Curated annotation (Swiss-Prot):
Keywords: Ribonucleoprotein, Ribosomal protein, RNA-binding, rRNA-binding. It comes from Rhodopseudomonas palustris (strain BisB18). Pfam families: Ribosomal_S4, S4. PANTHER family: 30S 40S RIBOSOMAL PROTEIN (PTHR11831), SMALL RIBOSOMAL SUBUNIT PROTEIN US4M (PTHR11831:SF4). Residues 94-157 form the S4 RNA-binding domain. Signal peptide: none annotated. Residues 18-46 are annotated as: Disordered. CDD domains: S4. One of the primary rRNA binding proteins, it binds directly to 16S rRNA where it nucleates assembly of the body of the 30S subunit. With S5 and S12 plays an important role in translational accuracy. It comes from the Bacteria. This is Small ribosomal subunit protein uS4.
Length: 205
């Protein structure tokens, strides 16, 4: 397992859940945390602990977004009309790295961030190298022509472990993805239960 994979799966081990639904996740082989004390039964979490865990899990899922960036997204979510938890998910799904991952241009959220940072992605015909770029409804995201034959891109396109959600329209031949609509929590294909309402409670303390 590579160092990057080890770092990625550390989130799974810490949460005790296979948060991306990956076949190679170490939690598929055990149901306890890492380390020599991993098999000890954990005590019941306080309300604060449950809320904190929900936040850590969602942050981890989106490639371990920094606390500063995640809180900024949360603040924006509270300023939008409607349910703040739903708004939070909608904003996270509008991130360019999330769209690239959902479209199956790469195999992981972490790879999506690196792929964008290295200049392999265009939005509406213009190169964008900022992973947190906010995609709008109707935007066309595409893999740069010279990057379409990269081995890891071709392999990701064939992954059977996840499907493209219906709020993104993908042309696998052209490697383009059109962002159709902002999704609700129920539209997002999370491998484990996410509870954004607990995150709203956490920040509202």
């Amino acid at each position: 397992m590579t160092k990057r994979s080890e770092a990625k799966y550390k989130i799974d081990r810490r949460m005790g859940q296979n948060i991306w639904g990956r076949p190679k996740s170490p939690v598929n082989r055990r149901e306890y945390g890492p380390g020599q004390h991993g098999q000890r039964r954990k005590g019941k979490l306080s309300d604060f602990g449950v809320q904190l865990r929900a936040k850590q899990k969602l942050k981890g899922y989106y490639a371990n977004i920094s606390e500063r960036q995640f809180h900024s997204i949360y603040v924006e979510a509270t300023r939008l009309k409607g349910d703040s938890g739903e708004n939070l998910i909608g904003l996270l799904e509008r991130r360019l790295d999330t769209v690239v991952y959902r479209a199956k241009f790469v195999s992981t959220m972490f790879a999506a961030r690196q792929f964008i940072n290295h200049g392999h992605v265009k939005v509406n015909g213009k190169r964008v190298n900022i992973a947190s770029y906010k995609v709008k409804v109707g935007d066309l995201v595409e893999v740069k022509e010279s990057s379409k034959q990269l081995t890891f891109v071709l392999e990701a396109n064939q992954l059977a472990e996840r499907d493209v959600p219906d709020f993104i329209e993908v042309d696998h031949g052209k490697m383009t993805a059109k962002f159709i609509r902002i999704p609700h929590l129920s539209d997002v294909p999370f491998a484990v239960q996410m509870e954004p309402h607990l995150i709203v409670e956490f920040y509202s303390r």
